[in-house]
Amino acid sequence: MITLTYRIETPGSVETMADKIASDQSTGTFVPVPGETEELKSRVAARVLAIRPLENARHPTWPESAPDTLLHRADVDIAFPLEAIGTDLSALMTIAIGGVYSIKGMTGIRIVDMKLPEAFRSAHPGPQFGIAGSRRLTGVEGRPIIGTIVKPALGLRPHETAELVGELIGSGVDFIKDDEKLMSPAYSPLKERVAAIMPRILDHEQKTGKKVMYAFGISHADPDEMMRNHDIVAAAGGNCAVVNINSIGFGGMSFLRKRSSLVLHAHRNGWDVLTRDPGAGMDFKVYQQFWRLLGVDQFQINGIRIKYWEPDESFVSSFKAVSTPLFDAADCPLPVAGSGQWGGQAPETYERTGRTIDLLYLCGGGIVSHPGGPAAGVRAVQQAWQAAVAGIPLEVYAKDHPELAASIAKFSDGKGA
């Protein structure tokens, strides 16, 4: 069985709405039909497993009831037979998720959990590299992978990007990425950008033995064009790509993963429209399962004290979600903490994510805007993580670590990174 948990908000009966979801999303329609036999329903009809009442509300998520109407709320578990859906993710999205938002009689519905049976394990490839592969390719063990982003996000020409990358790879950083907004614009075609950047990365590897992982933006609405972008990166010796998962969709991701030799770094831009209203959409816990099955290797999930709307608690639950095996540990992608990060968030990130160092800690301005330059910025972030793991307050550790001290002086007001 495939089990979904729906958080229902309705001025009517929760039980009635639960039954309606189970019926409408499986065998039922607005009137009984001759073909809806008991035998058919026994095979493919969804059924309500449990209803857990929640506190009533007075403010509707959707404006379909007058303000101050009493609204009943509950978490409802509904099970769908595997025979009714199969293991196709587009079928799962359509049957168990897509149609529920249009059902009449609710003022809000949010999907808060999804449990998939073992059949999904073998039906989808999952991550090709994940945590272990990302560590192997960056050569980083015993600490978080430290990354940065090319800034400004847009406008740099290939030779200008390469100049900045040359400075960054000399800083000791482990990972660099194109901003998610940069793909292949006329002023910086991907082919030219790759040709400008990769020789610097390979030359640095030849001299030092360290190959910095660079994630190029290869997303495209045409899967064939996206695959050609992939091949440009791979042929030049690259090993990572930024993929805007909501823009390319399930089909694009599936097409890419089956043919990919690159680490696939998932950026979820656009995700907010699916989750920002707490009474509608879905939890990240549900959303991320689709993309992990499809094969993302690294998953960007914001961080602590970010520059966007998402609260810290949401990041913590997202981190837990991607770090929890669907079926086994190999299907966990590398969590990527980013957005306004510098070393100052390292202690809280470490403590609130289960004291793990298995993450990519992504700092844009927190590295490139350091008063001592990018190399000092990288050292400051590394020092912050050393302090976090050792349980030493940053201010104490900074007394003997000038790069961290300078970082605290610049960024501790929360406005600089």
Curated annotation (Swiss-Prot):
Gene3D superfamilies hit by this protein: Ribulose bisphosphate carboxylase, large subunit, C-terminal domain, RuBisCO large subunit, N-terminal domain
Binding residue positions for Mg(2+): 177, 179-180
The entry's keywords: Carbohydrate metabolism, Decarboxylase, Lyase, Magnesium, Metal-binding, Plasmid
Regions annotated as coiled coil: none
CDD domains: RLP_NonPhot
Pfam families: RuBisCO_large, RuBisCO_large_N
Cofactor names: Mg(2+)
Reactions this protein catalyses: 3-oxoisoapionate 4-phosphate + H(+) = L-erythrulose 1-phosphate + CO2
Pathway info: Carbohydrate metabolism
UniProt modified residues of type N6-carboxylysine: 177
Gene Ontology molecular-function annotations: magnesium ion binding; ribulose-bisphosphate carboxylase activity
EC number of this enzyme: 4.1.1.121
Biological process terms in GO annotation: carbon fixation
Assigned protein family: Belongs to the RuBisCO large chain family.
Function: Involved in catabolism of D-apiose. Catalyzes the decarboxylation of 3-oxo-isoapionate 4-phosphate to L-erythrulose 1-phosphate.
NCBIfam families per the UniProt record, alphabetical: OxoIsoapPDcar_OiaX
Name the record gives this protein: 3-oxo-isoapionate-4-phosphate decarboxylase
Organism from which the protein derives: Rhizobium etli (strain ATCC 51251 / DSM 11541 / JCM 21823 / NBRC 15573 / CFN 42)
